[in-house]
């Protein structure tokens, strides 16, 4: 953790280290290109967005909270911790992610394009876009709600689940879907 705090001090990032060792940063934190950063401390809270592209990070700490967006594109991340909280978008494109934790809630968009993800957890909540293009996804969970558009192009999905709700555009191009459920709700183009 001292290496992480040293980086914060060097970058003149206002932060608070609480008595329990947790670190609170109220603004955005960009660690872009910092290959020397290989881990983050447990119980880290970032009020703004967290940019980790080009770091040596391969896992995220327990109880990470990001008020803005979390950018992990192109990192060595292969899994996400339980209790991850992301208020904005979560960008996992180009990572080794193959699964998501149960009850994951993403306030903004969730970008999974080109990952090895093969299924989505129950109770997944996405406030913005959900991009599953070019993934190994073959089915969607029942009661999935996506606030923005849902991109399913070039997936193995052959049917849509009951009670699917999409606030924006539903992209079914190059899927095996041949019929739509009666209770499908799409706010934009289909």
Q: Which sequence ranges carry the predicted segments?
A:
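N-terminal capping/linker segments that flank leucine-rich repeat
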Residues: 1-35
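Thr-biased low-complexity repeat/linker tracts and other Thr-enriched repetitive architectures
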Residues: 38-190
């Amino acid at each position: 953790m001292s290496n992480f705090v040293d980086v914060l001090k060097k970058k003149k990032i206002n932060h608070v280290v609480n008595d329990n060792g947790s670190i609170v940063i109220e603004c955005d934190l960009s660690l872009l290109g910092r290959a020397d950063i290989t881990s983050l401390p447990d119980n880290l809270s970032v009020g703004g967005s967290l940019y980790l592209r080009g770091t040596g990070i391969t896992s995220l700490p327990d109880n990470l909270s990001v008020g803005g967006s979390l950018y992990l594109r192109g990192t060595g991340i292969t899994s996400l911790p339980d209790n991850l909280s992301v208020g904005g978008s979560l960008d996992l494109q180009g990572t080794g992610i193959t699964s998501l934790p149960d009850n994951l809630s993403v306030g903004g968009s969730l970008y999974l394009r080109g990952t090895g993800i093969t299924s989505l957890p129950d109770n997944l909540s996405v406030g913005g876009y959900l991009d599953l293009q070019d993934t190994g996804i073959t089915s969607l969970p029942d009661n999935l709600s996506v606030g923005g558009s849902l991109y399913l192009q070039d997936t193995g999905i052959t049917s849509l689940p009951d009670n699917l709700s999409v606030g924006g555009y539903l992209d079914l191009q190059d899927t095996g879907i041949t019929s739509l459920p009666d209770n499908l709700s799409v706010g934009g183009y289909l």
